[in-house]
Curated annotation (Swiss-Prot):
Residues 1-332 are annotated as: Uridylyltransferase. Its EC number is 2.7.7.59, 3.1.4.-. The lineage of its organism: Bacteria, Pseudomonadati, Pseudomonadota, Gammaproteobacteria, Vibrionales. Its cofactor is Mg(2+). This is Bifunctional uridylyltransferase/uridylyl-removing enzyme. Residues 333-692 are annotated as: Uridylyl-removing. Uridylyltransferase (UTase) activity is inhibited by glutamine, while glutamine activates uridylyl-removing (UR) activity. Signal peptide: none annotated.
């Protein structure tokens, strides 16, 4: 990189314009060097060196070098000699005595010039005494001063500061260590104590650069080590750990450098908006989002390695240095292990290398003994070494297979062993397939965890089904799970359900075969292996059916029951499905989904018990609903004749698709109407099927569905289900299942306003124009190709249309308006949002009441794609 050294700038070059030009040349040279794969360490160090020269030249220009007893000092990251393109340049103007006013004015001009150059300068002007006083009270200041580096000015003044900072009285090593540990805990808590965040902060997230800094700060305070290399020389790190930390730091630096050259303002968050460009800069390429997912996989794996090293090394430091090697007395477990306090440790230094299967033994002891919380630091170091020296996966060792199955069958392994096995890399060392999903992310808003993290959370959710206290949240699973004969089959299905992701092809099919082979290899019977592999293959079946199919259609229930075949499979599947949803995204599970899955579960259970050769008698169900609804209405004072006259206007489908309580509720208000010409809008005061039911009764009008959903969308409510029905005499009986933005039923306090506005737009009779709103920030960075598919159905009267599109505001309203404009009748809708994707099902008929023709389907597809494309403002 050829550029002029700032020390050689003449006075004419020290104008804002000239200096900006020189800084731009330097920045562009660094950017080009980075894109040409120049080592990032050289670039980070050379940027700090360039700033050293520039600040030194300006210091001299302002005449500060002629003044005794003041120094210009780099602190913080700049003090370490590390600067990324947008890093803060933290400087300290240090003096022995308080500066006179005229000198402070001149220093202010110096700092203002740096700001005019658009440099992110953080500065302080302090005496040595002030630094000492503030540093003793403020951990951040103390840490920055520890990394102080003289740029120019008085060496003596700087050495006075160093004497203060290095003295034991400034921050005793143990006090500093405890404070930094607490600081790290608080920082990790801000990121939910996980390395897996969708838009991670490269610097501050657990496993990020700050975790490496914390190690260096602690070692510097205790040993005086000024680099990772010196830390290894003091024995704080082994050579292998030193190389690993350097490798991790190098990757994180490359990610941060790539991010900074894309930004105009300082930020360390790897947002969706910038993941694409960063991946490209780092050479990660692939079809679609493959490049991003590959880059983020490497990123998350690096965070895991740093987090593991950070935790282990700090504990070793605490045990060996702070506590002087004193430990609690050992309690012998067997010839291989002992317990010391709440930690398990190996009794032999090379146990895991000599007999790798004992790694699994250790976790069996953890599962057995509730007094053991984790692994001792020396044993963790031994485990890390053994893990890296394994020449084959653990599952290839017969003894290890036996112990793994012992763990899978152990009643305490779910909540005591598996999460720790994953965290310490043992699952990846056991299963080659698991090692492939570690850090595997999906570039979307639906999956908030990497595949491995999601799978472990799924196992943890399964464990919650064992406790009666969770019955209200998971009534079916808490009833079903305890009676499963072989819970280990469910756990194996959970481990394998997503194991095929990231390898191309259908992950369910990949996992199905690998799960079967694994089960046979581990001594399970063929029927057991078939059940596990079936669960893996169909782990999405129940969720998709409940949320995206009309589960009140007997045909849908029959088809689902045929795939499930028996109640045993149904019970395993419902537990896997619920745990899968809960482990995908903490915001996904709500009373609406619970109700849908419960209705599908019990409907299928009844179908299986009745026998699939004995379908539901539709007429009997209608009669049953009418009898119960009529009894409720008569209690309210209505005569049988009034009820009969009203029901003669309704079609049979109405009585089939509503419960008797819904029918009675609707009809009571219809019969009490003073003016049948006015619209009627009802909202259920109690949550119905997990949401708020909005019922609309009015004369049919053009684009009524679009009008209602547009009004609800305007109020930030989400329609999840709609049943669109008409009476024989031209009235609509439409039911919308609505949730608020948090997936809950609408607050009763809002009902009056919602009803008022809906009645107003319905009485107006004119279709509500779909108002476009700005696409939410997070959605702006995702592309979802609009797809319109027409699904096969046995019905000769109706068409099933599936729409996949970006979940843009107004999507449902514009879809409904398109149906109306083309003269198609909408009979039902199932609305599903999967992160940034809308996956909606609509039941349609033509203007004549029959199925859409192929030509009509083609026209509808083209029109919808066109109208949705114009939605975005």
């Amino acid at each position: 990189m050829a550029f002029q050294s700032p020390l050689t700038f003449n006075d004419e070059q020290l104008t804002v314009a000239q200096l900006k030009s020189q800084l731009d040349l330097f920045a562009n040279a660094q950017k080009q060097a980075f894109l040409n794969h120049h080592p990032v360490t050289d670039l980070v160090l050379s940027r700090a060196e360039y700033m050293d020269l520039l600040l030194t030249r300006l210091w001299r220009y302002y005449g500060f070098s002629e003044i005794h007893n003041i120094s210009l000092v780099a602190v913080g990251g700049y003090g370490r000699g590390e600067l990324h393109p947008l890093s803060d340049i933290d400087i300290l103007v240090l003096s022995k005595h308080k500066l006179p006013g005229e000198l402070e004015t001149k220093l202010s001009e110096f700092i203002t010039l740096l700001w005019d150059l658009r440099l992110e300068v953080g500065h302080a002007v302090r005496t040595v005494e002030e630094c000492a006083a503030i540093g003793r009270e403020d951990l951040t200041v103390a840490t920055n001063l520890q990394e102080a580096r003289l740029l120019c000015g008085s060496e003596n003044t700087f050495q006075d500061l160093k004497k203060v900072v290095l003295s034991d009285s400034f921050w005793p090593s143990e006090t500093f260590y405890r404070a930094k540990i607490q600081e790290q805990r608080e920082r990790h808590a801000r990121y939910h104590d996980t390395t897996y965040n969708l838009e991670p902060d490269i610097k501050s997230t657990p496993g990020g650069l700050r975790d490496i800094h914390t190690l260096s700060w602690v070692a510097r305070r205790h040993f005086g080590a000024t680099s990772l290399l010196e830390m290894s020389r003091y024995g704080f790190l082994t050579d292998a750990e030193y190389r690993e930390l350097v490798e991790c730091q190098d990757f994180l630096w490359r990610v941060r450098f790539a991010l900074h050259i894309e930004l105009k303002r300082y930020d360390n968050r790897l947002t969706f908006a910038h993941q694409i460009q960063v991946a490209e800069h780092l050479g990660f390429k692939g079809e679609g989002n493959r490049g991003i997912e590959m880059m983020m996989k490497e990123f998350y794996r690096t965070l895991r390695r740093v987090a593991e090293l950070n935790k282990m090394l700090l504990k070793l430091f605490d045990q060996a240095i702070i506590n002087g090697g004193e430990t609690e007395p050992a309690v012998i477990i067997n010839e291989d292990f002992q317990r010391r306090g709440r930690l398990i440790e190996a009794r032999k230094p090379a146990l895991f290398q000599a007999r790798p299967e004992t790694i699994l033994d250790m976790f069996l002891h953890i599962a057995n003994d509730s007094t053991i919380d984790s692994v001792s630091p020396p044993t963790l170091r031994q485990l890390r070494t053994a893990r890296r020296r394994l020449n084959k996966f653990l599952h290839t060792i017969p003894e290890a297979r036996e112990k793994f199955m012992e763990l899978v069958r152990h009643p305490n392994a779910l909540h005591r062993a598996f999460s720790l096995m994953h965290k310490l890399g043992v699952l990846a060392a056991y299963l080659p397939q698991w090692s492939q999903i570690v850090g595997q992310m999906q570039f979307d808003l639906f999956h908030v965890y990497t595949v491995d993290e999601h799978s472990v959370r799924l196992l943890n959710h399964i464990n919650t089904f064992s406790y009666a206290k969770n019955h209200d949240k998971h009534p079916i699973c808490c009833e079903v799970y305890p009676r499963l004969q072989k819970k280990e089959l469910l756990l194996l299905a959970a481990i394998f359900h997503d194991i095929g992701k990231g390898r191309g092809g259908d992950h369910s099919e990949i996992g199905e075969k690998e799960a079967y082979d694994f089960c046979i290899e581990h001594g399970l019977s063929k029927p057991e292996a078939k059940l596990v592999s079936w669960l893996v293959r169909h782990h999405l079946l129940m969720s998709v059916t409940a949320q995206r199919r009309d589960i009140y259609d007997p045909e849908v229930i029959t088809e689902f029951a045929k795939q499930v075949r028996d109640e045993e499979r149904l019970e395993y599947l419902v537990c896997l499905t619920v745990a899968d949803i809960c482990a995908t995204n903490p915001e996904l599970w709500n009373s609406w989904k619970r109700t849908l899955l419960a209705e599908l579960f019990y409907s299928t259970q009844r179908a299986l018990r009745r026998g699939l050769e004995n379908p539901v008698d539709v007429r009997e169900r209608i009669r049953h609903n009418q009898q119960l609804a009529s009894a409720l209405l008569r209690k309210e004072g209505f005569t049988a004749r009034e009820i009969e006259v009203l029901w003669q206007r309704f079609k049979a489908d109405y009585f089939l698709r509503h419960t008797h309580k819904q029918i009675a509720w609707h009809c009571e208000h219809i019969l009490r109407m003073d003016n049948p010409e006015q619209p009627l809008v009802l909202m259920s005061k109690k949550a119905t099927r997990g949401g708020t039911e909005v019922f609309v009764y009015t004369k049919d009008q053009h684009a009524l569905f679009a009008t209602v959903v547009a009004e609800l969308d305007r109020r930030n409510f989400n329609v999840h289900d709609a049943q669109i029905m008409s009476s024989k005499d031209g009235y609509v009986l439409d039911t919308f299942m609505v949730l608020d933005q948090h997936g809950q039923a609408i607050d009763v306090d809002n009902h009056k306003a919602v009803i008022k506005h809906l009645m107003h737009v319905l009485a107006d009779g004119r279709p509500t124009k779909v108002k476009t709103r700005r696409t939410p920030y997070k959605l702006q960075h995702f592309k979802v190709k609009t797809k319109v598919d027409f699904l096969p159905t046995k019905s000769k009267k109706r068409t099933l249309m599936e729409l996949v599109a970006l979940d843009t505001p107004g999507l449902l309203a514009i879809t409904g308006a398109t149906f109306a404009d083309m003269g198609f009748n909408l009979h039902g809708a199932k609305i599903t949002t999967i992160g940034e994707r809308a996956e909606d099902l609509f039941i349609l008929t033509s203007e004549n009441g029959g199925r859409l023709s192929e030509e009509q389907e083609l026209q509808l597809r083209e029109k919808l794609i066109h109208n949705i494309a114009e939605l975005a403002p």
